[in-house]
C-alpha cells in the first residue's frame, strides 16, 4: 500500500543514489586526471635514447654543435623530444624522430636541412636574411626570418602566405 511517507522515502533514496553516482564519477575523473598528470611531462634523457632518425638528423646537420640538454615530453596523446645545443639552437622532434621545429636564434640554419626550393626562393627574394626558425607540418613548411618576416609554403613548396 502506497502512502505519502513511502513515496517521499523512495524519492529521497533515488536522490541519494544519484548523488552517490555523481560523487563516484567525480572521484573517478579526479583520479584519472591525477594519473594523466603524473604520467606526462618532461624527462631528461641521453642522446642515445632519441629515435634513430633524430640521432641521424643531429649527426648530419648539427654535428658541429654540442648538446647541452635532451628531453622527452610524454604528452597525453603523443610524445616528443627536444634537443638544446650550447649555442642556443633547439630542435623539436616528433615521436618517430622526424624534426618538427628548428630554432637557430643566433646562428645560421644548416643549409642542407632547408628544402632546395625554399632555399632558392629565399636567396632570390630575401638574399640578406637568415632563417631563425623553421617548422614542418607534414609536407608544409613555415620559416621565420631574422627580419621578422614569416613565410608559409604549401606541400609543393610554393609560397602560400607572407607575414611582415
PLM segments and residue spans:
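Bacterial Sec-dependent N-terminal signal peptides
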Residues: 5-42
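Interaction-mediating elements
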Residues: 40-164
Amino acid at each position: 500500500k502506497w502512502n505519502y511517507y513511502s513515496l517521499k522515502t523512495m524519492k529521497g533514496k533515488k536522490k541519494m543514489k544519484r548523488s552517490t553516482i555523481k560523487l563516484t564519477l567525480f572521484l573517478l575523473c579526479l583520479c584519472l586526471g591525477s594519473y594523466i598528470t603524473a604520467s606526462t611531462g618532461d624527462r631528461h634523457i641521453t642522446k642515445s635514447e632519441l629515435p634513430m632518425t633524430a640521432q641521424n638528423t643531429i649527426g648530419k646537420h648539427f654535428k658541429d654543435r654540442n648538446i647541452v640538454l635532451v628531453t622527452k615530453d610524454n604528452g597525453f596523446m603523443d610524445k616528443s623530444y627536444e634537443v638544446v645545443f650550447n649555442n642556443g639552437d633547439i630542435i623539436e622532434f616528433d615521436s618517430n624522430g622526424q624534426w618538427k621545429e628548428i630554432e637557430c636564434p643566433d646562428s645560421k640554419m644548416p643549409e642542407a636541412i632547408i628544402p632546395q626550393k625554399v632555399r632558392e626562393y629565399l636567396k632570390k627574394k630575401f638574399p640578406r636574411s637568415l632563417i631563425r626558425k623553421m617548422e614542418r607540418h607534414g609536407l608544409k613548411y613555415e620559416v621565420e626570418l631574422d627580419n621578422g618576416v614569416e613565410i608559409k609554403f604549401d606541400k609543393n613548396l610554393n609560397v602560400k602566405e607572407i607575414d611582415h
